[in-house]
């Protein structure tokens, strides 16, 4: 089942990249938290990370705020 947090990250990432069809978000369990793995095309990684990591930080902040209601901790990994 796809969570709201997965949909949120995928939606935003698709808006940022040149190849939205290659954006996937998978969830895997970690120690005390859920890990969301965001996969994008290798040429789009810079767009998802942003200058000095600002976009990645903003994505993680949105993920944290969204997950607060469900009381689940998430970590976001960006993979090319």
UniProtKB/Swiss-Prot annotation:
Complex formation: Forms a complex with KhpB.
Family according to the record: Belongs to the KhpA RNA-binding protein family.
This protein's record includes keyword Glycoprotein: no
Any one cellular-component term (Gene Ontology): cytoplasm
Alphabetical keyword list: Cell shape, Cell wall biogenesis/degradation, Chaperone, Cytoplasm, RNA-binding
Disulfide bridge positions per record: none
Location(s), subcellular: Cytoplasm
Molecular function terms from GO: RNA binding
Classification via SUPFAM superfamilies: Prokaryotic type KH domain (KH-domain type II) (SSF54814)
Source organism phylogeny: Bacteria, Pseudomonadati, Spirochaetota, Spirochaetia, Spirochaetales
UniProt-recorded name of the protein: RNA-binding protein KhpA
Function: A probable RNA chaperone. Forms a complex with KhpB which binds to cellular RNA and controls its expression. Plays a role in peptidoglycan (PG) homeostasis and cell length regulation.
Domain KH: 33-80
Keyword Protease attached: no
Encoding gene per record: khpA
Example GO biological process: cell wall organization
One Pfam family named in its UniProt record: KH_KhpA-B
